[in-house]
Amino acid sequence: WFICGVHGNEISGVDSGLMTAYHLLAAQNDEVAAAALKNSIVLIDPMQNPDGRDRFINYFRQNVGRFPDGDLQSAEHNEAWPGGRTNHYLFDMNRDWFVQSQPETRGRTKFYLEWFPQVVADQHEMGTNSSFYFAPPALPWNPNLTKTQLDWLTRLGRNNAAWFDRFKFDYFTREGYDSFYPGYGEGWPLFHGSIGMTYEQAGGPAGGLGILTNTGDTLSLFDRAYHHFTSGISTIEAASQHAGELIKEFHSYFNNAVNGNVGEY
């Protein structure tokens, strides 16, 4: 399950979600797409926060010139309050998954409980001068999560690394982003047995259509969306190749919860 755009001003995940859907449906002679359609069900939620995205897109259109300006000081890269991160009620929904205070969050958890996806990828953006983050996560590791889940995070991360190495994309793991808090878009699914992951692409609210980084390179919206698309195809590949194993271990997670040992507290 790909969930995109919970922060409405982190726009590349939305575009990559559409790219992924199109690729799976239209690709010709692609072994990854064929295996995915045969062995798995791919769910894509391309827009978790329509109100925040609407605020961001309207601000950008009102402040961009005839041609995009990559200079970070340009108005198009400096979003005004309240910005597009939050929903209509100015709530950060990537903190809300276990509180369930927002209608958008309740809609996602209802959908999750209808499908129980084995793998969940929550697509985000971060600062313009970073690269790309994927699992395994940073410490601390929540003790209520299982070793099997951590092993899967590592396996999926290694497949991402292989794809990124192939295209010479920069990335990092095990730093900055942990899986401790159950209110994240990756955290709540983890506590329900899924392999939940955050994917972070450089860009963020300042990214616009293109931004000059501190190395002098231009990071375009296409670049950002393509990096997310690449991690998505990698995730689909790994999950579809090991679909039977994922389902078996997902079943074991709930069986152990009911019949396994009781926790110390």
Language-model-detected regions and their locations in the chain:
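Short hydrophobic beta-strand segments
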Residues: 1-5, 262-265
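The substrate-binding groove and active-site-proximal loops of carbohydrate-active enzymes
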Residues: 6-10, 89-102, 109, 141-153, ...
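Extracytoplasmic/secreted proteins, especially bacterial periplasmic and envelope-associated proteins
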Residues: 12-19, 23, 43, 88, ...
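Surface-exposed loop and adjacent secondary-structure segments within mature catalytic domains
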Residues: 16-20, 34-101, 109-110, 124-143, ...
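Sec-exported extracytoplasmic/periplasmic mature domains
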Residues: 21-30, 98, 113-116, 165, ...
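Active-site-adjacent substrate-binding region
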Residues: 106-130, 151-177, 189
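Hard-cation-handling environments
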Residues: 166-265
